[in-house]
Amino acid sequence: MKTYWISLYLEISSQDNLKKYGEKAVPIIKSYGGKPVVRGGKLKSFSGPNVVRTVIWEFPTYDDAISCHESTDYKSAWTYAEDTTKRMMFIVEGLEH
């Protein structure tokens, strides 16, 4: 069942670090079957914390998304942005159609 990796960025203090993270992370995420659905774009928040950037990836399965996030390669990529980025991140299984 398709699964979604949702990242809500609350603060980004270094666009350079975020770019380096993206350069490393995107090929890793794609290697697990991830396909970008949302990467930035217009955002209007109606409740909750202010979100400055939203990223959503679609994965073939829940296990693929979890395996990607828990992989050594992905964790290594995240080190580029973790100290200059505050985000909330969720992995959510979609509906079966």
What are these regions (language model features)?
Residues 65-90:
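C-terminal structural segments of small proteins and small subunits
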Residues 1-54, 59-70, 93-97:
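Short S/T/G/P-rich N-terminal loop/turn motif that feeds into the first structured element of a domain
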